């Protein structure tokens, strides 16, 4: 399966959630994860490489820099079909910008995970990204996830935004709450606090994916990191 974390603009916690979800799948399931950093900032790969050099914990998965100039992955239809039909997770962290060079990735992804906030800037960029997916005729399943959600704050535009997004994809019921612990995330583990911060939305996400792909869960103790 091909899963892409994408937005039109940075700042919604896209890479943090991509890393957290890659970790969560690797920790919770037997499914192999392969990470691809398609963002020009290379934050995902940079963090993975930093963790690799420190060597404190065994790696959960490999991450590659995806260079569209050298890598012809999306020009090989047989390889694309192999990825889409596999129960392995090919997870892409896309750049927070709109460019035609990302069209193939967005078209061939099985799931596009779109983090958003209820700020005016995030709302506008999310709607622009939604329109772009329509423009390139992407038929990928679109899954919207609330990021850095503050449950103590009243979002005046939440009801209207939720209704609008639900017309174009699946809006996860559970948000990822604003937690400082997620800013200390690495690519090698999820401690219990980090798991608690993402458990509900990610379990909801895995349930959706599990309707199409075979998700094999590991037996796990609550005290385990990963």
Where are these regions (language model features)?
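P-loop/Walker-type NTP enzyme "switch/lid" segment
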Residues: 2, 6-8, 12, 19, ...
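Beta-strand-loop-alpha "switch" segments that mediate conformational coupling across diverse proteins
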Residues: 148-154, 159-192
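NTP-binding/hydrolysis catalytic cores, primarily Walker-type P-loop NTPases
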Residues: 188-226
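Structural beta-sheet core signal
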Residues: 34-35, 92, 114, 144-146
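Motif I (Walker A/P-loop) of helicase-class P-loop NTPases
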Residues: 15-22, 126-127
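Inter-motif core of Ras-like GTPase G domains
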Residues: 101-120
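Conserved C-terminal guanine-recognition region of P-loop GTPase G domains, centered on the G4
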Residues: 124-139
